Amino acid sequence: MQLNIPTWLTLFRVVMIPFFVLAFYLPFKWAPLCCALIFVLAAVTDWFDGFLARRWKQTTRFGAFLDPVADKVMVAMALVLVAEHFHSWWITLPAATMIAREIIISALREWMAEIGKRSSVAVSWIGKVKTTAQMLALVTLLWRPDDIVSGIGIAALYVAAVLTFWSMFQYLYAARHDLFEH
C-alpha cells in the first residue's frame, strides 16, 4: 500500500494525540498553551487531509477508514482531558454526551453502510457547525489562560452539546425507516 500526503496527514493527527495528552499533564505554566497548540495543529490536519484528498483525487479506502477514527479519538481524548481538568458535572455531562453521540453515529453510519444506505447519514451542515463549535470549545478549554477565555470555551461547549443532540436526532430521523423496519 502506497501512502499519499492526505493519508500521512491523517497518520500525523493520530501521532499527535499522545503528545497533546502528555502536554496537558506537564508541570509547567506553558503546558496548557502547548497542549492547545498541538491540538490545533492536529485539528488543522483534519481539514487539510480531506481537502487535499479530494483536490488531488487521492481518496483511499484506508484514508476513508482512518480519517473519522482519528477525528473521534482526538476529540474524545480532548473532551476527557477537559472534563478531568474542570472536575465538575456541568463540564463532564456535555463532554460525555458528545462522546456518546460520536459512538452512536459512528455505529449508525457503519450499519447504514452495511445495508447500502450510507448516503442517508452523510455529514450534514449542522454536523459541520457542531464540529466548529466543538473545536472552539476544546481549544479554549485546553488552553484556558483566564476566566474570560474559559467562559467562552464553556459557552462553546454547551453550543456544541446542543448541536450534538440536534445533529444526532437528524441522523437518527434520516435512518428511521431502516432502523424500525419490520
UniProtKB/Swiss-Prot annotation:
Gene3D superfamilies in alphabetical order: 1.20.120.1760
Membrane topology: Multi-pass membrane protein
Cytoplasmic domain ranges by topology: 1-12, 82-86, 169-181
UniProt-annotated location(s): Cell inner membrane
EC numbers for this chain: 2.7.8.5
Keyword match Magnesium: no
GO cellular component, one term: plasma membrane
Pfam families: CDP-OH_P_transf (PF01066)
UniProt cross-references to InterPro entries, sorted A to Z: CDP-alcohol_PTase-I, CDP-OH_P_trans, CDP-OH_PTrfase_TM_dom, CDP_ALCOHOL_P_TRANSF_CS, PGP_synthase_bac, Phosphatidylglycerol_P_synth
GO molecular function: CDP-diacylglycerol-glycerol-3-phosphate 3-phosphatidyltransferase activity
Role noted for this protein: Catalyzes the conversion of cytidine diphosphate diacylglycerol (CDP-DG) and glycerol 3-phosphate into phosphatidylglycerol. Essential for the synthesis of anionic phospholipids, thereby playing a role in balancing the ratio of zwitterionic and anionic phospholipids, which is thought to be important for normal membrane function.
Name by which UniProt lists this protein: CDP-diacylglycerol--glycerol-3-phosphate 3-phosphatidyltransferase
Gene source species: Sodalis glossinidius (strain morsitans)
